[in-house]
Amino acid sequence: MAKAFGKTSGSMLPWLGLALILLIADQFTKVLILGYYRLGDATYVTSFFNVVRVHNTGAAFSFLASASGWQRWFFTGLGIAAAVFIVWLLRSHAGQKLFSFALACILGGAVGNVIDRTLHGYVVDFLDFHYGNWHFPAFNIADSAITIGAIFLVLDELRRVRRS
């Protein structure tokens, strides 16, 4: 049985592999968007989904997007710090499957968005879900991976609390 803290059995390599797959999927889709779409271009796919090209200089939901530019480096540093911390956690808890899956998702997404901020100064978003005139803020594969990872972290904690 895995311990709540401390080393557990298992290799972190499969989790790093999952993070790498998510990172590659994220960057590949962003390369396609940057290559085929100009800023603001949109393809209407369904009555509720578009593919668009949006540049997000802020964080989730464009938080701090209108700041003077310092946020690029702040969020880049935060992403790097999160990635280092996640790798450290994976080394210690690789045998905890649900926890490690969640961390791998967050790691892949965080690194994907750090790459964008470093190369472009913004994160490339392109998935646009909407209903009528209401639009959910555009997002990308990295954002999806981070969200899925966060959901699984909560589920893992609920499972852990339920067992105790």
Swiss-Prot record:
It is a multi-pass membrane protein. It is found in: Cell inner membrane. InterPro entries: Peptidase_A8. GO terms for cellular component: plasma membrane. Pathway: Protein modification; lipoprotein biosynthesis (signal peptide cleavage). The active site is at D125, D143. GO terms for biological process: proteolysis. It catalyses: Release of signal peptides from bacterial membrane prolipoproteins. Hydrolyzes -Xaa-Yaa-Zaa-|-(S,diacylglyceryl)Cys-, in which Xaa is hydrophobic (preferably Leu), and Yaa (Ala or Ser) and Zaa (Gly or Ala) have small, neutral side chains. The chain crosses the membrane at residues 15-35, 70-90, 95-115, 135-155. Its EC number is 3.4.23.36. This protein specifically catalyzes the removal of signal peptides from prolipoproteins. PANTHER family: LIPOPROTEIN SIGNAL PEPTIDASE. HAMAP family: LspA. This is Lipoprotein signal peptidase. The gene is lspA.
